[in-house]
Design a protein with these regions (language model features):
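Conserved SGNH/GDSL esterase-like catalytic core that processes O-acyl groups on lipids
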Residues: 113-216, 220-329, 405-406
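Structured segments of extracytoplasmic/periplasmic soluble domains
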Residues: 116, 122-130, 300-303, 312, ...
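Catalytic His-Asp segment of secreted/periplasmic serine-dependent ester chemistry enzymes
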Residues: 294, 354-425
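Surface-exposed receptor/substrate recognition regions of extracellular proteins
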Residues: 1-83, 91-102
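Active-site segments of SGNH/GDSL-like serine hydrolases
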Residues: 310-319, 335-368
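Alpha-helical scaffolding within the catalytic cores
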Residues: 81-97, 289-301, 329-337, 364-368
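Short hydrophobic beta-strand that contains or immediately precedes a catalytic carboxylate
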Residues: 106-110
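Loop/turn elements at helix/coil->beta-strand transitions in domains of secreted/extracellular proteins
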Residues: 101-105, 131-134, 273-276, 304-309, ...
Length: 425
């Protein structure tokens, strides 16, 4: 038969080399060559060439040939994943491009890398240039520069809650960024100034107090009073139908006889084509501090409706961490809480780069956890750790503003690479 002829031909080649004939084991599994100890060096399985493995020389050659340096000894994971889980985000962008009345919503959260302006402003700039700007998104009640030039003014009388390693759980709720203000006075006020919007949602805890919110119409402030119902839940009120212009949003506690807690604001421009990019980070936070308020995010996610949540975390954890298992559990729990509200929301886990801090646990270990979670939890991964070189090298190139945080240059570098890798899709 033809099979016999082929086998005889193979033996005619192999037998002189080994001085022995190679037996036919089965039609589907045929040894190609054995050594003196009868080890099979390679074989044919169902007619296809196969072997047990390749050595370092062939491996290196293949790595060079396919330019897959991330799978060699020094780069054992990809710089980023392939964006396949961001279907909600991609669909919203496609709707926007088709002229539909939709606003893709990007939410950036994590530690100081996401509360500070440099990275958030760079990402917002990329989105605005490509799709248009549909508003500021989230505005924290804590001080700190806003990416759009807006600001806040907080009077005396407010107590600030800021989730941190020493803060404990919030007694009166908090924002999606783990921050909140509360008061029992009747003279406190809080203003968000110089913000462009047509719509604003104010988030508060339904305690036993009274507050007012308002905005100017024709130079006269229009006020609305909220009498809280003491349910203890997080609620929100909506200001809508305002003209698309820069304005101030006011809140005050006139007539209050209980406790008022304000958690944050969300601004957008209704009817404007573009993306909303929310900056909702918390400087100093560890991953497991997200668990202080992960059970309080339903009101935010159900009303803001982010299409993708990007998390930059680990810059504090590696310096004061209790270990990577705590870090892993915190991210798993937080993502599960988000998906309980928005099952199809996309996630991007962003591993921070090497900074000039003193490590308690190697930062690379946290990067590895984030990549592993991207595989097990079906989300995306982006490694700033591998995008950047060492802190010394990147600081010399102007990418850091201090020992721990990115400069405008660093933010632009990250945003550009993130956009090409995942945001564009």
């Amino acid at each position: 038969s033809f099979k016999t002829k082929i086998w005889n031909y193979i033996n005619s080649i192999i037998s002189p080399a080994l001085n022995k004939a190679v037996p036919l084991v089965s039609a589907g599994f045929v040894p190609g060559m054995t050594d003196g100890a009868d080890n099979v060096l390679f074989w044919f399985q169902d007619g296809e060439f196969d072997a047990n493995g390749v050595g370092p020389n062939i491996s290196a050659s293949l790595a060079r040939a396919y330019q897959r340096r991330m799978y060699t000894a020094y780069y054992n994971m990809p710089l980023h994943t392939d964006s396949r889980t961001l279907w909600r985000w991609k669909a919203k962008k496609a709707q926007l491009k088709a002229g539909m009345a939709t606003q893709p919503n990007f939410l950036l959260t994590g530690d100081s890398w996401t509360q500070n302006n440099e990275l958030a402003t760079a990402i917002a700039g990329v989105l605005s240039a490509e799709y248009g700007d549909a508003g500021l998104g989230w505005r924290t009640v804590n001080y700190g520069a806003s990416r759009d030039g807006s600001n806040i003014f907080r009077s005396a009388g407010w107590d600030l809650y800021d989730a941190s390693p020493t803060s404990g759980a919030p007694l009166y709720g908090c924002g999606i960024d783990g921050q909140s203000i509360n008061t029992t006075t009747n003279t406190a006020y809080f203003n968000v100034t110089n913000v462009r919007c047509t719509d604003c949602r104010i988030y508060y805890q339904d305690l036993n107090g009274t507050f007012q919110y308002g905005y100017d119409v024709g130079g006269v402030t229009q006020w609305t009073t909220v009498v809280c119902g003491n349910t203890g839940t997080t609620k929100s009120v909506l200001l809508t139908g305002m003209t698309d212009e820069v304005r101030t949003i006011y809140t005050k506690t006139d007539g209050n006889a209980g406790r008022v807690a304000i958690h944050g604001f969300y601004f957008w421009r209704s009817g404007v084509a573009g993306c909303v990019m929310s900056k909702a980070g918390n400087a100093g936070i560890l991953a497991d501090q997200f668990l202080l308020f992960s059970d309080k995010i339903s009101e935010y996610l159900s009303t803001i409706q982010p299409d993708v949540i990007a998390i930059v975390i680990g810059n504090n954890d590696y310096r004061i961490s209790t270990g990577t298992q705590t870090f892993r559990t915190a991210l798993q729990t937080y993502m599960a809480a988000c998906r309980a509200v928005l099952p199809d929301v996309g996630f991007i886990l962003m591993a921070p780069p090497r900074t000039n801090g003193t490590a308690v646990t190697p930062l690379v270990d946290f990067r590895d956890v984030m990549y592993d979670l991207s595989q097990t939890l079906n989300c995306e991964f982006f490694s700033i750790y591998d995008l950047f070189d060492t802190w010394t090298e990147m600081n010399g190139l102007g990418c850091f503003i201090d020992n721990l945080h990115p400069s405008t240059v660093g933010g632009n570098m990250i945003a550009s690479s993130l956009n090409n890798a995942l945001i564009k899709g």
